Amino acid sequence: MAGCRGSLCCCCRWCCCCGERETRTPEELTILGETQEEEDEILPRKDYESLDYDRCINDPYLEVLETMDNKKGRRYEAVKWMVVFAIGVCTGLVGLFVDFFVRLFTQLKFGVVQTSVEECSQKGCLALSLLELLGFNLTFVFLASLLVLIEPVAAGSGIPEVKCYLNGVKVPGIVRLRTLLCKVLGVLFSVAGGLFVEKEGPMIHSGSVVGAGLPQFQSISLRKIQFNFPYFRSDRDKRDFVSAGAAAGVAAAFGAPIGGTLFSLEEGSSFWNQGLTWKVLFCSMSATFTLNFFRSGIQFGSWGSFQLPGLLNFGEFKCSDSDKKCHLWTAMDLGFFVVMGVIGGLLGATFNCLNKRLAKYRMRNVHPKPKLVRVLESLLVSLVTTVVVFVASMVLGECRQMSSSSQIGNDSFQLQVTEDVNSSIKTFFCPNDTYNDMATLFFNPQESAILQLFHQDGTFSPVTLALFFVLYFLLACWTYGISVPSGLFVPSLLCGAAFGRLVANVLKSYIGLGHIYSGTFALIGAAAFLGGVVRMTISLTVILIESTNEITYGLPIMVTLMVAKWTGDFFNKGIYDIHVGLRGVPLLEWETEVEMDKLRASDIMEPNLTYVYPHTRIQSLVSILRTTVHHAFPVVTENRGNEKEFMKGNQLISNNIKFKKSSILTRAGEQRKRSQSMKSYPSSELRNMCDEHIASEEPAEKEDLLQQMLERRYTPYPNLYPDQSPSEDWTMEERFRPLTFHGLILRSQLVTLLVRGVCYSESQSSASQPRLSYAEMAEDYPRYPDIHDLDLTLLNPRMIVDVTPYMNPSPFTVSPNTHVSQVFNLFRTMGLRHLPVVNAVGEIVGIITRHNLTYEFLQARLRQHYQTI
């Protein structure tokens, strides 16, 4: 497999998940990205490993296929359906656990503080009430921060990490049991601590962890939990279950099983088929109805009523029976919705821009410092948020008249929604029959505040709504990214709902549009702002429709989200894509830009290969594995034929051979071409060295300077054949000699063969080599042994390993002339990790990895392409 070396790849100074990486600790940030032209700065990047989504069809796998019949196939499929159902049920139970304790802690906190405020408002001891609120919030946030110290990947919503995992990037620790425990417990405390975060977004990450861990029936964190379960021992199977778990998390959070399925398709999975669609939808349904069953029973005491489908419920949107002029929305309102979509996109782009700058500041000034600094930052955010909420509720609120009518439906669910709206009204410092509008929004759980904006018949002051929006916008932006488990869906919905309600108030009070329904504008405002932040369209439309249970909102929500996305995309990316980029994850988008088709596979591949032979000595394998970090190696043989004799005496044959040679791309030729292009596009290292020698070297020596530098940088390939002797004077053709490609073998497979003693003596036939079954090869999944932990004294370096039974003899390959768009589509849709480039005569000339298809790498190659035209 190919690595990327800074001296050879002038367009790219960093190494990626599948290429050669520099030695560093996982916590260390290294400057790996290029200078960003729009910001003129270098972003820190990390090395990431890719996942093996491509199936390795080797001899052990074929042996399993030989024993497979229709009966076993049906049993395997039945087990998969049962596992999918279990994932949905467990995800629903996780949501139930989170919701129960968040409600418990929040009610306890607000109950104590509200009682204190009511008593101290007359005694003049409001400072004591503020201290009580600070005590609750700081304690909860401190506990949430401690849990993130235990498992740092539990911070945030986890959606960017899950998106990367489904895209094929292995994010360390993302789907571990310890991560799930820290995530679930941490989100309890962060939400109860009054931070402007939510519990619904982290449900996606929690569901993904359940989906990844449950089918394995074992845990790294709890090593005693070990079951001999023979199924689903590959990244390919785990990816499908993670997709189902992520969809189940969305379904449990919003009561939207179809929206969850579309979310998994739109935002995550790069590979999809009809069978997976049914399983993901079934998993989402299982999660929704599990949560619905238990929540309805616990809150209403009516088991089996299924009245609370998700953690977040918007209630029923319905005009008052006494208002005959009211309509949920009209055709004329669509114009206002489009304008709101534009404003929502602008606000979302502003939010993302500010949060990106904050994230960069944290990466440079907070994360490199001791971990205690992260805890202190979280406590500072909690302190400021608590003071702002308390002071704004006490000082900036206005007393508004309570509505004389209530929207009470015929069903118990709508009655519950109405009771929640009425019971969450806060009357701080207001006379009878009035309420404090600012305190009603700030001194309630976010879900209750959203219901107030959606369904409260009473009015909110435009000044209050504007102040609430500004304060909430800034604090939510500051909060997202601190070291606590958090989410952004509900804060964005609440912020957008305030914006929409403000628009409705302005239209009613100053333009005289009395027919409009304020709840509709609050919903559209919520959709506009959320769409401007996350840039989701299809899945978010369905999620909001399912949450409102009102299909007539389909058109305005879809139009608003599309306009918000188009507006926001003009300025920057969505919030999750921004954080993926800041982490340096080599995420592959859905497709490449049209301009990239000017490049071909030969332009982006890595010709400097590290390879193995079909029969290789143990000493050579150990040397290769210990001196490189590549995750796959081409299995090759050398071409030693001499075609010069055939070219004598027959002009026809001579011309045919010359044509064949001219049409076949070789690694030496490609390397020489790149060496020439580097003279016109030198790296700083080459430029400095050239400057040092420019005065003393003769013209002939100048031309060979780059060649000499490149040859000195690379040591000859390890000697694997006894009749070859290493030479420091190898030419480019000798170093990049033709190699016939036979297949790919993974690092994990080679290490497994060495650990299990799969080899044979030189005096024996390769048939005497022990054979491993498919189950034995996958026994150590997902954490295979490391070559550096291998006891070399137990190995005979002269023994030979026959890798041919265990290599993949038929991986996907491309021609050197394949356009980049074709390479990209094949790589992404098939979930590949390595893509060999093979010429017309079966010789491998390079290899393409995820790194070679990232936007930064392709842009750099395109610039180099323009330089050489």
From Swiss-Prot:
GO MF terms on file? antiporter activity; ATP binding; chloride transmembrane transporter activity; voltage-gated chloride channel activity
Placement of sequence motif Selectivity filter part_1: 156-160
* Intramembrane portions: 159-166, 241-253, 257-265, 519-533, 534-536, 537-548, 549-552
Give, from the UniProt record, the effect of changing E267A: Loss of proton and chloride transport
Instruction: Motif Selectivity filter part_3 — list its residue ranges.
Output: 487-491
Question: Biological process (GO) annotations?
Answer: cell volume homeostasis; chloride transport; monoatomic ion transmembrane transport; response to mechanical stimulus; signal transduction
Q: What is known about the tissue distribution of this protein?
A: Testis, ovary, small intestine, brain and skeletal muscle. Low level expression in aortic and coronary vascular smooth muscle cells, and aortic endothelial cells. Isoform 3 is only detected in kidney.
Q: Give the recorded effect for S157P.
A: Increases the nitrate/chloride conductance ratio
CBS domain mapped to chain residues: 605-662, 807-868
Motif Selectivity filter part_2: which residue numbers? 198-202
> What is its membrane topology?
Multi-pass membrane protein
Question: Mind telling me how this protein is modified after translation?
Answer: N-glycosylated on several asparagine residues.
Q: Which domain of life is it from?
A: Eukaryota
The positions annotated as site (Mediates proton transfer from the protein to the inner aqueous phase) read E267
Which stretches of this protein does UniProt put in the Cytoplasmic compartment?
Answer: 1-80, 572-869
UniProt site positions, description: Mediates proton transfer from the outer aqueous phase to the interior of the protein: E200
Sequence positions bearing Phosphoserine: S773
Q: Which disease is it linked to?
A: Ceroid lipofuscinosis, neuronal, 15: An autosomal dominant, progressive, neurodegenerative disorder characterized by severe global developmental delay, impaired intellectual development, poor or absent speech, hypotonia, impaired motor development, respiratory insufficiency, and feeding difficulties. Most patients have visual defects, including cortical visual blindness, nystagmus, and esotropia. Brain imaging shows abnormalities affecting the brainstem, cerebellum, and corticospinal tracts. Disease onset is in infancy or early childhood.
Query: Hey, which family's this protein in?
Result: Belongs to the chloride channel (TC 2.A.49) family. ClC-6/CLCN6 subfamily.
Tell me, what does this protein do in biology?
Voltage-gated channel mediating the exchange of chloride ions against protons. Functions as antiporter and contributes to the acidification of the late endosome lumen. The CLC channel family contains both chloride channels and proton-coupled anion transporters that exchange chloride or another anion for protons. The presence of conserved gating glutamate residues is typical for family members that function as antiporters.
The identity of this protein, by name, is H(+)/Cl(-) exchange transporter 6
